[in-house]
Amino acid sequence: MPLKRQIRLKTAIILPFVLTFLFMILAMAAVQTYRYEQTVKELSSKKLSYLTDSISQRLSDFLNRPFFANQMIAYNVGFHHLYQLNDVSRIEDFIRSAANPIGNNIQQFDVVGFGGVNGEYVGLRRDAPEQYSLMLKDARTDDKLVIYQTAVMNDQLRTVIDNYDPRVRPWFSPVAQKPSPQWSSVYTNMDEKQEITLSALSPVFQDKTFIGVMVSDVKLNTFNLFLSELKQRMNADVYVMDQQHRLIAHSGDGSVVSWGTPLSPKGERLLASENHNPIIRSSAAQLDLQGLNVGTFTTYVNQQR
């Protein structure tokens, strides 16, 4: 009996200390885990904020440079009274003289062109560094859109397109309705390449009269290349999508154009949630649930945050 009482007495004295010690250890571990999580969240938030600001700044510069250059060209065409009815030769000469200086300084300049209120069109398309194709429609081409192999009129033709009217194109009609500098929606060019593009648009005025639209293309392939370079510098996946959650450009490999899926018919741009990159796909799926106005959110890919 005395031995049992001694054991019980020891247990009664030691057990509270053991339980208190274990509770303190667990409490300290919980506090440390909480502090670690908070530190990780704070560092992640700061890094994400830095990446977002840096990428936004670079993206703004990428788009602003052709946007403002296009306005400058539009102003000069109107100021120097270069437009003539059914004859865009003077605008052609001006665009040709400006193409190399602007193209060398703004690599994302893919096409620069002018569409007139009477259906004329002239443009230069960059096929390679300092190599351009002239695209022309006026009285000299019998009102057909002729695409040449070089930057000047000659007998070396790439293609001829009948019944081309720039006034009904997605880059002309929005400016005709609201004459102000703006970006076009994403659309497909009507040349022989039929590439998907985004265009900077500016109205052209001559003696305060609206005479046409100056257009500068940023092709989506060029946009993708820019985002791919950003990914290498920033170590972050980047993508741009429209209000319908369809991809405009992304930093990974592959086209944004669908070859045919249950959600995206052939020729349509893919949904961001259909991208083969699991990080982009997971992020896009979260945006589908929370909407485009959400700020910061967390996703998991292969059990990694």
Model-inferred region functions:
Residues R65-Q182, L227-L230:
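Extracytoplasmic/periplasmic sensory segments of membrane signal-transduction proteins
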Residues Q108-F109, K193-L198, Q232-N235:
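Short, small/polar residue-rich loop motifs at catalytic or cofactor-binding pockets
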